[in-house]
Regions:
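Generic C-terminus detector
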Residues: 236, 527, 540-542, 548, ...
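Glycine-rich oxoanion-binding loops at beta->alpha junctions
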Residues: 48-61, 258-271, 295-331, 478-494
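Glycine-rich, anion-gripping cofactor-binding loops and their flanking helix/strand elements
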Residues: 150, 159-165, 169-187, 313-347, ...
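Conserved short alpha-helical segments that host acidic/polar catalytic motifs at enzyme active sites
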Residues: 1-234, 238, 245-279, 317, ...
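Active-site phosphate/pyrophosphate-binding segments
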Residues: 131, 243-247, 251-281, 371-500, ...
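Structural motif
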Residues: 45, 73, 279-281, 327, ...
């Protein structure tokens, strides 16, 4: 796992005599090897970890594994426990003390507390603890009083179990690469799953809801691409189809449909400053900037606070006016985008509250944030962003709704209406993806186009921008997005029988106006492809092709209407024989200017 970067390493080893040896070292794994070389490294079960500091500085003390107060448990963890501060306060009230400044130590102490208080076995205590946790994790836990087992679990952080000979040995890692030399039989744990690995027995998997899961063993080769694509031809296609699950992960623990409320610790941490904000400034690049445009409309509509959306690369250099009452929101999939990070740091220097919306746990923007929200959509490998966009839009939706409700701009009844609809989005996404065969056929007609226009109004305008970006990124077709009303101010001059014009024309308050815009293109023989709400006959009678999305509230529609546009871009690129996952001249994470 060294290729991922780290600042310290550690290992815990169990022998059969209820003895546990733990060795840690700051710096390279070679430092750990040297320090442990002359010590007892016997044992038949072990867990190890390479750490990249998030909570707590790089040090031997903060390195994993972390040990429970009674010395019985050891735990390694990737991810961040978002509510660790509240849990730590609770445990301190129960008499627990802490040696490190990490969130991970809080988790292992919580597991001990549950064992002591409720008499649960290791697996039961882990499950109970994780039900109280908000955040991302991939963990492995051992108990020296039960030295024949390891309990592992994951949420929004990858975890792979390699199956050895006769199911009598197991290997754990964040991905398959470190363990393929030992076995090619892998089980990829899904979010919310807990696995019990016991010496000489087959693995058992359960969900946090205590549902049994049949382990699905995959035979893999040593090609990392094959391992990570999950059977899909490209990462991008896999990530498009991942979106219903990703959005479920994104809202889990935040959108509480039964309790009819939205819970965001980010608001609670800085409630006064957020509620008194005079302005929000969103800084982002590329796809994240498009998500920010949607966020602007939602925050202004629901919280009644003005919002500026800035390209981070422009914002950082133009001597912007930033005041202490401002809240600056940085949006970035990787959390490492150089311009966005620099703009964020500038805002921090000027006294603004810095709010991060990122996907990668522990990234630079995450560490620089005063507060923020992880999208929790999982690693995104394809250069052309897909699930990161929908995750960002969902997080912004939750944030804007929660903020508006706190400020009294949204009634409880209105909030409940949105909560109900948002909880249905993952299933509605699946319905959109079920139309992929139709989308593929429509895409074929765009393969030889040299240009394309994308049009939308209101919340659909940023969707049009994002659809155009996807097409140009991976198919190399020149595509531009515009507000549909701006068509008469220039773009309509480009419309003829060879110009595809893609309209995002779902039902909203400006529907009749965009219908007129579609008629204008039709009158000039433009080739019209439209994303519409199911049952829309008016557009269907005009357009060359239509793709329907399930009926939903207008503000929520971008989460659905973007999916066909992602698929169109993907299929066009495949038809053209292009490298979908690694388009020319582009990088996944732009960490330099």
């Amino acid at each position: 796992m060294e290729y991922r970067g780290y600042d310290s390493a550690g290992v815990a080893l169990l022998a059969g005599d209820h003895k546990m040896n733990i060795y840690k070292s700051k710096g390279k794994v070679s430092n750990l090897e040297e320090s442990a070389a002359s010590k007892d490294i016997s044992g038949h079960i072990g867990i190890a970890h390479t750490r990249w500091a998030t909570h707590g500085e790089p040090s031997t003390l903060n390195a994993h594994p972390h040990v429970s107060q009674n010395g019985r448990l050891a735990l390694v963890h990737n991810g961040i426990i978002e509510n660790y501060s509240n849990l730590k306060t609770f445990l301190e009230g129960k008499g627990f003390t802490f040696k490190s400044s990490t969130d991970t130590e809080v988790l292992v102490q919580l597991i001990q507390f549950i064992q002591d208080e409720y008499g649960k076995d290791l697996e039961g205590a882990v499950v109970s603890a994780l039900r109280r946790v908000t955040g991302a994790y991939a963990i492995a836990v051992v108990d020296k009083e039960n030295p024949d087992k390891i309990v592992v679990a994951r949420k929004s952080s990858p975890l792979v179990v390699g199956i050895g000979e006769d199911h009598k040995e197991f290997f754990l890692a964040s991905d398959a690469l470190p363990i393929v030399e030992y076995t090619k039989q892998m089980v990829y744990l899904n979010d919310g799953e807990v696995a019990l690995l016991k010496v000489g027995q087959k693995m058992e998997i359960h969900t946090l809801d205590n549902e049994d899961v049949d382990p699905k063993i995959k035979e893999v080769d040593v090609n990392l691409d094959t391992l990570e694509k999950g059977g899909y031809e490209h990462f991008m296609l896999k990530e498009i189809y991942d979106q219903p699950r990703c959005i479920s992960d994104c809202i889990r623990g935040r959108l509480l449909a039964d309790e009819k409320k939205i819970v965001l610790s980010a608001i609670n941490q800085h409630r006064d400053r957020l509620l008194r904000a005079s302005r929000f400034i969103i800084v982002a690049c590329g796809t994240s900037w498009h998500a920010g445009l949607i966020g602007k409309q939602m925050i202004e509509q629901w919280a009644k606070i003005p919002v500026d959306v800035e390209y981070a690369s422009e914002f950082r250099y133009r001597k912007p006016v930033i005041q202490p009452g401002d809240v600056v929101i940085a949006i970035s999939q990787s959390g490492e985008t150089a311009d966005t990070l620099a703009a964020f740091e500038l805002a921090k220097e000027r006294g603004a509250l810095c709010f991060g919306i990122v996907n990668v746990v522990g990234s630079s923007i995450a560490r620089a944030s005063d507060t923020g929200i992880y999208t929790h959509v999982g690693p995104e490998i394809g250069v052309a962003s897909t699930k990161a966009f929908t995750g960002q839009v969902m997080v912004l939706t939750l944030f804007a709704l929660a903020l508006g409700h706190e400020l009294g701009s949204i009634s409880q009844m209105e909030l409940e209406k949105y909560i109900t609809e948002l909880s249905l989005i993952p299933e509605k996404m699946k319905k959109v993806l079920e139309q992929d065969a139709l989308t593929k056929d429509i895409s074929r007609t765009l393969t030889y186009a040299r240009n394309a226009l994308y049009m939308g109004r209101g919340f659909n305008y940023p969707v049009a921008l994002e659809g155009a970006l996807k097409l140009k990124e991976i198919s190399y077709i020149h595509a531009e997005g515009y507000p549909a009303a701006e068509m008469k101010h220039g773009p309509i001059a480009l419309v003829d029988e060879n110009m595809p014009v893609v309209f995002v024309a779902t039902h909203h308050q400006l529907y009749k106006k965009i219908l007129s815009n579609i008629q204008e293109v039709k009158a000039r023989n433009g080739r019209i492809i439209a994303i519409v709400t199911e049952g829309d006959e008016a557009v269907k009678n005009i357009a060359e092709a239509t793709i329907e999305i399930p009926a939903t509230l207008p503000v929520v529609a971008p989460l659905l209407s973007i999916l066909p546009l992602q698929l169109i871009a993907y299929h066009v690129a495949v038809f053209k024989g292009l490298n979908v996952d690694q388009p020319r001249n582009l990088a996944k994470s732009v960490t330099v200017e």
